[in-house]
């Protein structure tokens, strides 16, 4: 059977997502990634370079996935927020990776910062074009924050909302809050 480098690369990325989401960059171990990917460490270094470069590749993949799966609709920010809630429910690892990035890099430049900044500016432009709210930049930031905070801090969500606050109710409450923010 011929070696499938694309399949190996995918397995490495999948294993790296789980490893980095659980342990961050500093705590992640290339040995565990290789074992879980059924690959050797040499393949990781060959395809991705060092551990930080692998983390950057993981983030790029995850952020591309959320951007493709949940495009912004400047005319329907509450619906966009609900779709973000759905995404974070199905893919909690994405927020965990972003939180690890924030913890480990702080306010330093992040991988592919220029491209990521352009991506968020496109969101701001979509909100501005829809004439939603007085401050499109703040509205995008607040929408992203409201839609993700309860997933980034599940313990706080539980303490404030209790255990009987249904996911549907949370989703609807987030949409209502975003709707109120966008009201001129």
Predicted feature residues:
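Amphipathic alpha-helical linker/stalk segments
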Residues: 22, 56-83, 120-126
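Amphipathic alpha-helical packing segments from all-alpha helical-bundle domains
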Residues: 67, 71, 106-141, 168, ...
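C-terminal peripheral helix-coil segments that are non-catalytic and often amphipathic
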Residues: 86, 90, 121-130, 150-184
């Amino acid at each position: 059977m011929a070696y499938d480098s694309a399949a190996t690369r995918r397995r490495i990325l999948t294993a790296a997502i789980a490893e980095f989401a659980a342990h961050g960059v500093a705590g992640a171990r290339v040995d565990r990634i290789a074992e879980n990917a059924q690959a050797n460490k040499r393949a990781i270094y060959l395809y991705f370079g060092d551990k930080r470069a692998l983390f950057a590749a993981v983030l790029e993949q995850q952020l591309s996935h959320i951007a493709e799966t949940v495009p912004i609709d400047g005319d329907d920010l509450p619906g966009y927020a609900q779709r973000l809630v759905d995404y974070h429910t199905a893919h909690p690892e994405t927020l965990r990776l972003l939180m690890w990035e924030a913890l480990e890099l702080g306010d330093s430049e992040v991988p592919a910062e220029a491209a990521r900044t352009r991506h968020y500016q496109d969101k701001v432009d979509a909100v501005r074009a829809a004439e939603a709210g007085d401050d499109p930049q703040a509205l995008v930031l607040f929408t992203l924050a409201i839609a993700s905070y309860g997933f980034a801090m599940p313990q706080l969500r539980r303490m404030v909302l209790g255990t009987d606050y249904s996911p549907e109710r949370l989703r609807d409450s987030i949409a209502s809050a975003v709707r109120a923010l966008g009201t001129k």
